[in-house]
């Protein structure tokens, strides 16, 4: 396949994936929406699904489907197994939605995917906490409905539970490293940053979708999973660093969100890099302005980052990281097709959103 054909194939996969969402909503709501006792709650679930699971890039969910297609020989890709792969892909997207709805409340965010955060909508507020729980429990309802008879059912349940736990541990590290109103720059070390990123982002964004497809393709060996994890966690680290960079230097019309890392006192890659390079005077500027809500203080931190040319530091890091990941793919991809990892790398490097 040449580049254009690959793009067309990907666009088709994406379209099929998005079209499957109506079936997901139907399966989760159709039976009980007219129920005399819980019908109203199911109407709310439908609304929650339709507002929060849609509008992203669908990279995580699509990764399940694309990896499944790469791993399973065409003759065994019958309509039922493809339906299951699409559904498990949507389970990953629902996990993402569960995290994002919760995360936006914790970070006091305003927009997500180019629209108002769910909890910010009139009449929603902190009821969004329970809505997030609904998104999470929908995952296990779908897995039961579609995969209960499959030999990999338990592997998938354990994988989703483990990924949720790891992400929640990462979020805990993130929150305790950046308590609101208590700026302690000494906490922002490279070591702590890497731990946050590995647990909060890399497991569920990169390992989970590939591992899910591996289990569905009958690949359950520890060695194969450990090797895939080695590559995917590194990719996840790069992806989060890129996200931190785009939080401040990205274009909100592209990213769909307005970054809040500076005012939220976050242990971001940019602040870690700044601290590694700062003179005592520059550190003082950071101390006085970081983690504060005032627009002029946020602007002062951004000006400091620009003064220290952190954009150039990032560009160099992106280059080095890409080369490092290519080396890992060469070393650890087999027996899986390298195309799985190369396709993911292609999607994330040089992205703008």
From Swiss-Prot:
This chain's source organism reads: Bos taurus (Bovine)
* Record-given protein name: Farnesyl pyrophosphate synthase
Summarizing the function annotation, the protein's role is:
Key enzyme in isoprenoid biosynthesis which catalyzes the formation of farnesyl diphosphate (FPP), a precursor for several classes of essential metabolites including sterols, dolichols, carotenoids, and ubiquinones. FPP also serves as substrate for protein farnesylation and geranylgeranylation. Catalyzes the sequential condensation of isopentenyl pyrophosphate with the allylic pyrophosphates, dimethylallyl pyrophosphate, and then with the resultant geranylpyrophosphate to the ultimate product farnesyl pyrophosphate.
Where does this protein hold Mg(2+) 1? 103, 107
| GO-annotated cellular components | cytoplasmic vesicle
Q: Which residues carry this modification: N6-acetyllysine?
A: 57
Keyword presence, NADP: no
**At which residues is N6-(2-hydroxyisobutyryl)lysine found?**
57
């Amino acid at each position: 396949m040449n580049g254009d054909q690959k793009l067309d194939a990907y666009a088709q996969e994406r379209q099929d994936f998005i079209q499957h969402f109506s079936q997901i909503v139907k399966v989760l709501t159709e039976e009980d929406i007219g129920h005399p006792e819980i019908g109203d709650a199911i109407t709310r679930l439908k609304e929650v699904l339709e507002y929060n699971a849609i509008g992203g890039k669908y990279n995580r969910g699509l990764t399940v489907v694309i990896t499944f297609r790469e791993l399973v020989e065409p003759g065994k890709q019958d309509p039922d197994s493809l339906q299951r792969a699409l559904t498990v892909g949507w389970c990953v997207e629902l996990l993402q939605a569960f995290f994002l709805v919760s995360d936006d409340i914790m970070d006091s965010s305003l927009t997500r995917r180019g629209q108002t955060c769910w909890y910010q909508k009139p009449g929603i507020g902190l009821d969004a906490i329970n809505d997030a729980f609904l998104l999470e429990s929908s995952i296990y309802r779908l897995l039961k409905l579609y995969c209960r008879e499959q030999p990999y059912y338990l592997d998938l349940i354990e994988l989703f539970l483990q990924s949720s736990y790891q992400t929640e541990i990462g979020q805990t590290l993130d929150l305790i490293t950046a308590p609101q109103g208590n700026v302690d720059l000494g906490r922002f070390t490279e070591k702590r940053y890497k731990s946050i990123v590995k647990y909060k982002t890399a497991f569920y964004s990169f390992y989970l979708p590939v591992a899910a497809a591996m289990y569905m393709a009958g690949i359950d060996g520890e060695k194969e999973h450990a090797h895939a994890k080695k590559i995917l966690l590194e990719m996840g680290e790069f992806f989060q660093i890129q996200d931190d960079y785009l939080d401040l230097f990205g274009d909100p019309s592209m990213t769909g969100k307005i970054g809040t890392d500076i005012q939220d006192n976050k242990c971001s890659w940019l602040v870690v890099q700044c601290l590694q390079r700062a003179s005592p005077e520059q550190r003082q500027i950071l101390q006085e302005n970081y983690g504060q809500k005032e627009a002029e203080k946020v602007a002062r931190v951004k000006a400091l980052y620009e003064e220290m040319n952190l954009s150039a530091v990032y560009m160099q890091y992106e280059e080095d990281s890409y080369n490092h990941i290519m080396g890992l793919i060469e070393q650890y991809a087999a027996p899986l097709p390298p195309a799985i990892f190369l396709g993911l790398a292609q999607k994330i490097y040089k992205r703008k959103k």
